Amino acid sequence: MLQIKSGSRLFEKGRPLAITIADILALALFKQREGIETKKAVYEIFEPPCSYKTLVVSINRFSLLAARILMILVKLNQRKAHLVKHTDSTDIPVCNNRKARYHKAMKFFARWGKTGKGWFYGLKLHITTDLKGKLLALKLTPGNTDDRKVFCSLNKDLDGFFIADAGYISKELEKTFDTDTRIILAIPRANMKKILTDWQYSLIQTRMRIELNFRNLKLFYGLISNLPRSENGYFANYIYSILAYCLK
């Protein structure tokens, strides 16, 4: 009997699958990589040997395995990470703001949050990358989460120089996080009287690289979508999107 272990769960092969696990993952990643909006379009392109409903259920089900693969890639990236790292978060709306009060699929996870672009209803994606753009850590939280409260748990296994924007400025965070092997450097606000050294300024100039990760995930890998009709569908979309980006 074939068994694929993902954490404490087992995907057991009892009755033969109409479509293999490898094909399920490949189709899901193809959808994200090519920016295809719906699973229906993928089904019509490849015409797999199963029903459309079976394909949708399988893609959502095996997102747990995709998440396991993603975590393995993150751990591998951590081993050879650059000393300079960037931490930031981005908004992931689950629906249009005008439809938020009627939204049901993600009502237990989505919350109202605010960014520099305005209000949104959904989640936040927090990530840490190194100077080479490799993903080192990630976490999904409700949209109203304070970035500073996530920072320490997100980067607990990492060392080096951590570059962050002004939203992470906190004396308590610096006191808690800074050690002999790691230090956080937050970009000062315009109204703050803080003098930067040349090397600090040079490091801060590299922070825009993490914005490219968010831009690519949203524009080219379908991170944001309001089409799923269930919690599993939404989280599967996020997992496959990030995994496809890491495998690019």
Task: Mark where each language-model region is.
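Short alpha-helical elements
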Residues: 1-248
